Amino acid sequence: MADVNDFLRNWGGRQEPTISEKIKNLFKSQQPLRYRLVMANYRLRTTISRLDVYISKLQERDRSLFEKVVESQISKDSARAAMYANEIAEIRKITKQLLTTEIALEQVQLRLETITEIGDIFTSLVPVIGVIRELRNVMKGVMPELSIELADLEEGLQEVVLEAGEFTGARVDFATSSPEARKILDEASAVAEQRMKEKFPSLPSFATSVDQKTNANQK
């Protein structure tokens, strides 16, 4: 097990490594742990900003289709109203997934900021990795490029934990999602549900009933 001085050097990157450490580090990332956490946080902010833009575009698309539903109702074109309502339902399903991801990543970002300040890697970073892994899987079918970004971020944070483990002798199981990770995701989903109600108006009852009848006939 490495000593405290080794950990401090790897955390802040201030001291010169020994010859043997230089050889060993040829196979590792050369940035100190703290620097890598700062960069991970920067990447998270960029991802969150992209999600926000994408959600805004979906909201605008939803608004446009909602107006067409109303227009179709006025003209008594129930088939067209149902078509627009179906598309709105799909847009809102995707939007809720993106909102949940955005909110959860905001929580992850806050956690990373705290970890960067206090250096509490094992008790705080492992649940974060679990959250990112779950979100990566969800995003595969929605935004594949975002899923790839999250996979890279997850891998980088796992390396931080594993390297920190060399100094503490601690072991971690990345395959098992922690209760805290599940709690973060559940809370994000609940907040996303509430925001959906605030951001998106309910479909007119006529369009909703037509939509349900259309789906029933398709079964």
Curated annotation (Swiss-Prot):
Mutant lacking the gene: phenotype: Deletion mutant forms small colonies on selective plates. Forms enlarged cells, with a highly elevated content of DNA.
Signal peptide range in chain numbering: none
Keywords attached to this entry: Cell cycle, Cell division
Entries under InterPro entries matching the protein: Cell_Div_Machinery_Comp
Induction trigger: Expression is highest in dividing cells.
Domain of life: Archaea
Residue ranges of the TM segments: none
UniProt-listed GO biological process terms: cell division
Function field: Part of a cell division machinery.
Name recorded for this polypeptide: Cell division protein B2
Organism: Sulfolobus acidocaldarius (strain ATCC 33909 / DSM 639 / JCM 8929 / NBRC 15157 / NCIMB 11770)
Name of the gene encoding the protein in the UniProt record: cdvB2
